[in-house]
Amino acid sequence: MTPTPGEADLTNTPAPRARRSVLSRGSWSETARIAGILRKETVGGAVLLVASAVALVWANSPWAESYFALRDLKIGAEPFGLHLNLTLGTWAADGLLAVFFLVVGLELKREFVAGDLRDPARAALPMAAAVGGMVVPALIFVAVTAPVGDGATRGWAIPTATDIAFAVAVLAVISTHLPAALRTFLLTLAVVDDLLAVTVIAVFYTDEINLTALGLSIVPLALFALCVQRRIRSWWLLLPLGVATWVLMHESGVHATVAGVLLGFTVPVLRSVAAGGPEAGPGLAEHFEHRLRPLSAGVAVPVFAFFAAGVAIGGVSGLTRALSDPITLGIILGLVVGKPVGIFLTTRVLTAVTRANLDDALRWIDVFGVALLAGIGFTVSLLIGDLAYGLGSDRDDFVKVGVLTGSLVAALIAAVLLRVRNRHYRAVWLQETADTDRDGVPDVYQSQRD
């Protein structure tokens, strides 16, 4: 029928495009994988908290001297002129944390090759949010410490890191049923945070470089890469190559934990065609991650925390002095205010710019709660504090007080916010776990089954 004058012809009017949703639920395979990672990190987080508490109590007990004597005990040698006569605290920071960063490297590569970060549309939000969560706390720290002078701003990167083990331990304590999309967002944020942290450590906290040692480190790294590309799993071969890479990287002046990330990057995520292709099963990266994550979360990080978290507070007067220092204040404000505000505002702005909608199951208060969890910076923050001001220095002690206080405050505020929303989270969780046909895949993922 021909429309009369004044009437619009609606027959050929295109339907309005549906707005894209951000922080929506991912695939079942990715959700299940992330749930498994977070379960392991929860146990690691509990061990981390215990190790930190023991260090704090010991460092402020009548036996404090024995704690610091143990931390500063030198073990090692200097074969072939290599500087490997290190204190236990340094072995923990440079050596054990290399295992942690090896797992980070494996996780990063998997995310970029087969995880959420392989899709530019899905990767843009957490990557931008992580950058925002790095820039804002760094600016706050610099603004607070700049008037002090004397290199106080050197620790600008301290409040920029997220400790995923600590964060998921908080979630376990408050017993919240965080939706899968928020868990994925938190883990992806932490993964990108770790990538940024490694970059910052390598670029900004390397004073002098021994180019010969750095060049030589490429040899065992390349041999390691050759072996894993050929799917060689023999630890009697891979371990010496990994250790040699670490030793030469340490000797070069670049922080040795960078070696862990580079080794992780060389491991293939997907099976080659010769090995049966991607459908033949998990790649070597997943195999290594499965073996190494318990060692990283249950041993490497807690031992580092034990040696890094011990600070002699000196009673009420000492605590007051530490809390009034600009370095401590800059860290606390960076973690509690800068980190969540940076993540939240970046997420909000990017959502508005791309004309997307927040997923129907979520509210912006949920995003802010997760952003507060990202303000729990512990392991990497303490490591950067050691690099910025020197292990055992007065400023390093202020760093420890700031990181511990800021992380605790961020955790408490996040716990309150997320706990208030827990009834809604539980309803979402029941929907996400309902499996009426008992085939092992929840009903909401049936259309995405892969």
Swiss-Prot record:
Presence of the UniProt keyword Transmembrane helix in the record: yes
Topological type in the membrane: Multi-pass membrane protein
Family label: Belongs to the NhaA Na(+)/H(+) (TC 2.A.33) antiporter family.
UniProt-annotated location(s): Cell membrane
Annotated protein name in UniProt: Na(+)/H(+) antiporter NhaA 2
Example of a GO cellular component annotation carried by this entry: plasma membrane
PANTHER family linked to this entry: NA(+)_H(+) ANTIPORTER NHAA, SODIUM ION/PROTON ANTIPORTER NHAA-RELATED
HAMAP family to which the protein is assigned, alphabetical: NhaA (MF_01844)
Record gene name: nhaA2
Keywords: Antiport, Cell membrane, Ion transport, Membrane, Sodium, Sodium transport, Transmembrane, Transmembrane helix, Transport
Pfam families: Na_H_antiport_1
Catalyzed chemical reaction(s): Na(+)(in) + 2 H(+)(out) = Na(+)(out) + 2 H(+)(in)
Superkingdom per UniProt: Bacteria
Function as written in the Swiss-Prot or TrEMBL entry: Na(+)/H(+) antiporter that extrudes sodium in exchange for external protons.
UniProt main location, coarse: membrane
Source organism: Mycobacterium sp. (strain KMS)
